[in-house]
A protein has these predicted regions:
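Active-site-adjacent bridging/hinge elements
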Residues: 12-17, 37, 113-121
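Transmembrane beta-barrel outer-membrane domains
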Residues: 21-23, 31-35, 131-135
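Short, hydrophobic/aromatic alpha-helical segments in well-folded domains
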Residues: 124-125, 137-139
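Membrane-embedded beta-strands that build the outer-membrane beta-barrel scaffold
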Residues: 1-3, 38-46, 54-62, 138-144, ...
Length: 167
């Protein structure tokens, strides 16, 4: 079992620029991020014989990261995720979707003034909704051995992760 509490300084970030500069972005070193987590690895010989053996293994990791500082910039929007102080790196953002209007069947969004609109072009209040980096990930592996023949396999998993298709 390993535990860690790491600080990353001078993050290498692709900062978007105004189109008037003639460039779309600039790579800069900015900010600080913390990573805290646990890692567990275990392996056991269930059967250990001269000609036959079975081995099982388990690994699991948990990581929580937080953007702690971005220097002179408050936030970056990159694709479908936002880099903002206090959030985890890889946090998705989208329009604040409020569900379907039961009377019309149209989608409802929150506008910048707090009102509810059905027109996506008038919606402008963005909301975070998860992270594309898994908080938990791991796997279970096994090996079955008979004389000079062995068969092995690995099952992996991850959870507390959201994928988003921006099509």
């Amino acid at each position: 079992l390993d535990a860690y509490d790491e600080q990353t300084l001078d993050l290498f970030v692709n900062q978007p620029l105004s189109g008037t500069t003639g460039f779309s972005s600039l790579y800069i070193n900015a900010g600080r991020m913390s990573n805290k987590g646990l890692e567990l690895n275990a392996k056991v010989d269930v059967i250990r014989g001269r000609d036959f053996g079975v081995t099982l293994g388990l690994n699991h990791s948990y990581n929580k990261n937080t953007i702690e500082d971005l220097g002179a910039v408050n936030e970056f929007f990159l694709g479908t995720f936002v880099i903002r102080k206090g959030l985890s790196y890889g946090t998705h953002y989208t329009l604040n979707y409020l569900g379907v209007d039961p009377a019309t069947g149209n989608p409802r969004y929150e506008a910048p003034d707090g009102s509810i609109v059905n027109d996506q072009a008038k919606a402008g209040q963005f909301d975070k909704f998860g992270n594309y980096l898994p908080r938990h990930q791991g796997g279970v592996d096994f090996e079955i051995r008979y004389k000079a023949l062995s068969i092995s396999g690995l099952f992996s998993y991850q959870f507390e992760v959201q994928r988003y298709n921006n099509i």
